[in-house]
Design a protein with these regions (language model features):
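Bacterial N-terminal signal peptides that target proteins for export
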Residues: 1-9
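C-terminal motif of bacterial Sec signal peptides marking the signal peptidase cleavage site
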Residues: 17-21
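Bacterial signal peptide processing site
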Residues: 23-26
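Post-signal peptide N-terminal segment of mature Sec-exported envelope proteins
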Residues: 29-62
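Active-site-adjacent substrate-binding region
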Residues: 47, 55-58, 83, 106-108, ...
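Acidic/histidine-rich, surface-exposed loop or edge segments in extracytoplasmic proteins
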Residues: 47-53, 64-77, 144, 182, ...
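A non-catalytic alpha/beta surface segment that caps or lines the substrate-entry region
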Residues: 66-126
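Acidic/histidine-rich catalytic neighborhood of metal-dependent amide-processing enzymes
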Residues: 148-250, 264-267, 271-272
């Protein structure tokens, strides 16, 4: 993913979002073009939200953190790497007995052709529609020959989804179907561009648009870099404002609101963008201030010791509460 720049809420209200480039780390690649946001948070209409009901959702953060450590233990997992295949098998081993779609294809990249494997676990609900929760699981390709293991960037969110899967196993959901997506090849293999990035999720969005699945998706929730012990999820102008408002309401009901949307970032280039472009309500749940000035991002310092089970608890419980709120909102705001 790429962050373009920080903006204060006041500037967001008064200024148009600008096209810029990011040169955070030349060795780890990245420059990107911002997708303009159609509305700012202050323009989001007042939502009619259902009342709070029931105990907080179950989420085992200790187990989720163990998953995180197990993913990291495989080592670097860029596309085409033997460790990458081991992580694929690891994820699938946790989904035995579930309805799993394996979306496998070959990506043509600036560094050659690579196999790409999106894993989709489908949990059926009683309502017509789908809520998608996604995370990428690959690590940065340009850093493939270093000790970079992407503990926060890729492993934290992948572990989060495994624990969410535990909460959904063998349950008939009283609401929308929930699809969990571990998408592949999010990272650029050379330098971040529209063509060299988001390979897996772009393929999945195109496929679902072609087969009609896209029309059934009520919300697309992306988790990325959510394990930082100093957790602060930022508001993203490229995300759907009303959906971010629902996430904030979910966090507030659980007492976690201080960890959400205190700051606003410049538009994020991340796995939600192919769905944003297709009109699907989407939100990027991301903490892109990983160390001072994001110093640990895309470096070998992205390690488990900087992360916390509590952060996984905060995000995991908030995502499950978000699903519960969305299930009871009738109708959802228009796309």
């Amino acid at each position: 993913m790429i962050k373009i720049f920080f903006l204060s809420p006041i500037l967001l209200f008064s200024l148009a979002v600008t096209l810029v480039s990011c040169d955070h780390d030349k060795d780890s690649s990245q420059a990107a073009v911002q997708v303009p946001a159609s509305t700012t948070p202050s323009e989001s209409p007042k939502l009619s939200l259902p009342p709070d009901s029931g105990p907080p959702p179950e989420f085992d953060s200790t187990r989720a953190f163990q998953y995180l450590k197990e993913v990291v233990a495989f080592g670097p997992r860029p596309v085409g790497n033997a460790n990458h295949k081991k992580v694929e098998d690891y994820l699938l081993s946790h989904l035995k007995g579930d309805d799993v779609e394996n979306d496998i294809f070959t990506a043509d990249t600036p560094e050659g052709k690579f196999p790409v494997h999106n894993i989709v676990a489908k949990f059926p609900g009683t309502k017509d529609g789908i809520i998608v929760i996604a995370s990428h699981y690959d690590t940065n390709y340009p850093l493939r020959n270093t000790s970079y293991v992407g503990a926060n960037d890729g492993a934290s969110s992948s572990a989060l989804l495994l624990e969410i899967a535990n909460q959904l196993h063998a349950k008939k959901l009283d609401g929308y179907s929930v699809w969990l997506v571990w998408d592949d090849a999010e990272e650029a293999v050379k330098s971040w561009t529209d063509a060299d990035s988001l390979y897996g999720i772009r393929h999945l969005a195109e496929k679902w648009e072609a087969d009609g699945t896209l029309k059934k998706i009520k919300a697309f929730l992306l988790a990325d870099m959510i394990g930082d012990a100093d957790l602060s999820i930022e508001r993203d102008p490229n995300s759907t404002p009303w959906l971010e408002d629902v996430i904030y309401e979910a966090a507030t009901r659980l007492g976690y609101q201080s960890h959400f949307f205190v700051h606003t970032v410049g538009g994020m280039e991340d796995d939600h963008i192919p769905f944003v472009k297709r009109g699907v309500p989407s939100a990027d749940i991301i903490d892109f201030e990983y160390g001072y000035n994001n110093v640990f991002w895309h470096t070998p310092q992205d390690t488990v010791d900087k992360l916390s089970p509590k952060s996984l608890q905060i995000v995991g419980s908030t995502m499950l509460e978000t699903i519960r709120i969305l299930d009871k909102m009738d109708p959802l705001p228009p796309k």
